[in-house]
Amino acid sequence: MSKSIINLQSVENQQILSITPPNTGLSLQGTLQIPGDKSISHRALMLGAIAEGETIIAGLLLGEDPRSTAECFRAMGAQISPLNSEKVTIQGIGLGKLQEPLDVLNAGNSGTTMRLMLGLLASHPDRLFCVTGDASLRSRPMSRVIQPLQDMGANIWGRKNNTLAPLAVQGKSLKPIHYHSPIASAQVKSCILLAGLMTDGKTTVTEPALSRDHSERMLQAFGATLDIDSQTNSVTINGHPKLIGQTVIVPGDISSSAFWLVAASIVPGSELLIENVGINPTRTGILEALEMMGADITLENKRILTGEPVADLRVKSCQLKGCTIGGNIIPRLIDEVPILAVAGIFATGKTIIKDAAELRVKESDRLAVMASELTKMGAKITELPDGLEITGGTPLKAAEVDSYTDHRIAMSLAIAALNAKGKTIINRAEAAAISYPKFVETLQQVCGDSN
């Protein structure tokens, strides 16, 4: 097997990743353990902090986003052990007992931290909380959670007519509501359910389509009472449950697996086994989309871990074919659209991704950025108002591209570079550490690069 040359350099406060695949003979091989699921890691930290007693989390993602969550809840009184191993212990403080912090809470780059936490902060009477984030997070819309919280009686102030962070939250007693969300968003749903923990009565969220359900599963595991109506995509939570600390085993993140599923599919002669991956049905849109494209993926050793379905994923290279991806599947693969765009480049025919306008308000405008950066590499890709149109079959050439400090962009471009001719340079590659601290090491491993 010929080797790629993969180098990561630090230059002037940024990391630059360069990837030079061999002219012939590259194939990806190996068995991978991927980082813990980011969505589940956030929720385990939050619920452990507000539950009574001890919570033990095994397999926690040690990325920057969960660290932001841990720091915020430490500042409000929870005792959380250092995030320097994948086993973390939390001494919870009990529901309704978050302390007023001495300083501003910083959510970093994490929209999940800020949006979910707002539901808890708004429902703690007689306490003032100030929340901010990095430049990217301060530009992301918060009205989608602030509006329903205000409907519950919350007092929240922010920039741009209370839509952008930094935010000030004056906690108070909230009233239960039935909120009909205009978008399928697990962050919106989870924020309202967490606010509902402290209300007198039942709080309901109805969505236009099913979004990921990690919050519902974990709330039930910690002792909350929920009524879930899958026919109407509605979830109801009863206020004032007794939450008890739990042992949580975090499965591998299917969003992180997606990079290797696509990489092994598009690099000829490849075969990877990705172990211990969460296959929650609200997250498996990526598997269904790749199946539509003809990918050779098998699920082995299916099992249940702490209420979440898990399997090992075996993927072998094959010729992908273009297809149209849209509708209700989009909320179930929203984070995987950038890497799906890469799959489309190497598929025969045309791939259309639609109904994904939500990607314009992620860590970057992911539709615009993927179109611009892949075009630099020679891809035939056109931006749509709510998606991308990709014509496959055009060989990629090396180029200098930019992550725009977006972790999923950085990693998607790295996978594209494996099939590009020449040396591709990815600027601001440090963004990958937000959700996948050892991404470059794993890339070197599967490519047989010992650098």
Curated annotation (Swiss-Prot):
Pfam family of the protein (one): EPSP_synthase
Query: What pathway does the annotation place this protein in?
Result: Metabolic intermediate biosynthesis; chorismate biosynthesis; chorismate from D-erythrose 4-phosphate and phosphoenolpyruvate: step 6/7
Q: What GO MF annotations does this protein's record show?
A: 3-phosphoshikimate 1-carboxyvinyltransferase activity
Q: Name one GO cellular component term.
A: cytoplasm
List this protein's GO terms for biological process: amino acid biosynthetic process; aromatic amino acid family biosynthetic process; chorismate biosynthetic process
Record-listed 3-phosphoshikimate binding positions: 38-39, 43, 185, 187, 335, 362
Query: Function, please?
Result: Catalyzes the transfer of the enolpyruvyl moiety of phosphoenolpyruvate (PEP) to the 5-hydroxyl of shikimate-3-phosphate (S3P) to produce enolpyruvyl shikimate-3-phosphate and inorganic phosphate.
Query: Could you say which protein family the record assigns here?
Result: Belongs to the EPSP synthase family.
- Name of the molecule in the record: 3-phosphoshikimate 1-carboxyvinyltransferase
Which organism does this sequence originate in?
Answer: Crocosphaera subtropica (strain ATCC 51142 / BH68)
The taxonomic lineage of its organism, from the top, reads: Bacteria, Bacillati, Cyanobacteriota, Cyanophyceae, Oscillatoriophycideae
